[in-house]
């Protein structure tokens, strides 16, 4: 897969990035190099390799999930201009 100049312009437009015509060839080369690297990664045989979440072995600390109300709902909505119960009231935006 390769990226052409029109695709670079489209990506820049979608990302809302100003790209001059002089920058397009450079960015095209950069994007093509990235895609070539990703294609190399897809060719690596990872059969039998255990999935990793980190390069260093570690165990995540686990705790019991406890549901509570935080006991500060009144404090949270105290400065809101309009509330109902423990909910913020906001102006209607869509009819």
UniProtKB/Swiss-Prot annotation:
Pfam family of this protein, just one?
GatC
Q: Which residues form the signal peptide?
A: none
Identify the EC number(s).
6.3.5.-
EC class (word):
ligase
Keywords for this entry? ATP-binding, Ligase, Nucleotide-binding, Protein biosynthesis
GO molecular function term, any single one:
asparaginyl-tRNA synthase (glutamine-hydrolyzing) activity
Query: Domain of life of the organism in this record?
Result: Bacteria
Name the GO terms of the biological process aspect. glutaminyl-tRNAGln biosynthesis via transamidation; regulation of translational fidelity; translation
Q: Which reaction does it catalyse?
A: L-glutamyl-tRNA(Gln) + L-glutamine + ATP + H2O = L-glutaminyl-tRNA(Gln) + L-glutamate + ADP + phosphate + H(+); L-aspartyl-tRNA(Asn) + L-glutamine + ATP + H2O = L-asparaginyl-tRNA(Asn) + L-glutamate + ADP + phosphate + 2 H(+)
- Which intervals of the chain form a coiled coil? none
Describe the function of this protein.
Allows the formation of correctly charged Asn-tRNA(Asn) or Gln-tRNA(Gln) through the transamidation of misacylated Asp-tRNA(Asn) or Glu-tRNA(Gln) in organisms which lack either or both of asparaginyl-tRNA or glutaminyl-tRNA synthetases. The reaction takes place in the presence of glutamine and ATP through an activated phospho-Asp-tRNA(Asn) or phospho-Glu-tRNA(Gln).
Give the quaternary structure: Heterotrimer of A, B and C subunits.
Regarding protein family, the annotation reads:
Belongs to the GatC family.
Q: What is this protein called?
A: Aspartyl/glutamyl-tRNA(Asn/Gln) amidotransferase subunit C
């Amino acid at each position: 897969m390769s990226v052409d100049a029109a695709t670079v312009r489209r990506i820049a437009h979608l990302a809302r990035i100003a790209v001059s015509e002089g920058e397009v060839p450079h960015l095209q080369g950069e994007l093509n190099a990235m895609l070539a690297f990703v294609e190399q990664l897809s060719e690596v045989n990872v059969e039998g390799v255990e999935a990793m979440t980190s390069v260093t072995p570690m165990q995540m600390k686990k705790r019991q999930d406890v549901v509570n109300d935080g006991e500060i709902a009144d404090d949270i909505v105290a400065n809101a201009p309009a509330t109902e119960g423990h909910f913020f009231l906001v102006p209607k935006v869509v009819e």
